[in-house]
């Protein structure tokens, strides 16, 4: 579970101190997609960076399963999904997932990688190169990679922004099922409110505040 309590983040801009997040509090519940929506510049990306421990708030707390976020917690408990998937062109599909094991200092788990690829609809494609995959397939690789470390939280930064409507809904449906089945919390930044279902949670960000 992700809990952000009274989090404030500011940045220096010349002579001014700008407030990106203004004393925000919210939680992302396991088993649900929590959509984080708002206009450009509203603070969505800053919120996601704070949740991932990629920046330190000026004040407030960020907890994953009641533990303050630091580098160890980020490696052990958080899976990230990006807008462009951030895959390594020289590696095949399976090795994209195994990179996370190397980063975490554990023995590469090829069987787990293949199981996760099957789970996201890419069974038998472990030896394919990135250039042989469609945009939707690449995002499925990104989802499988995010699950390699058995996270309790997934943070997704506009993962459907480069996809058409049909592929976008497929990716969201896949994520929705995965977080329900595995009881994972998921913060999902998007500008596309048509992706949201009645079963999802919604956090609206405007001017650095949430509603």
Residue ranges and their predicted role:
Residues 12-14, 98-111, 119:
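ABC-type ATPase nucleotide-binding domains, specifically the catalytic core motifs of the NBD
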Residues 52:
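Helix-to-loop junction immediately C-terminal to a conserved catalytic motif
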Residues 60-68:
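Conserved ABC transporter NBD signature motif
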Residues 91-98:
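Short coil-to-helix segment of the ABC ATPase nucleotide-binding domain corresponding to the Q-loop/switch region
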Residues 128, 149:
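Conserved signature/switch motifs of ABC ATPase nucleotide-binding domains
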Residues 129-133, 137-139:
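Conserved ABC ATPase signature
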Residues 154-157:
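Catalytic Walker B motif of ABC-type/P-loop ATPase nucleotide-binding domains
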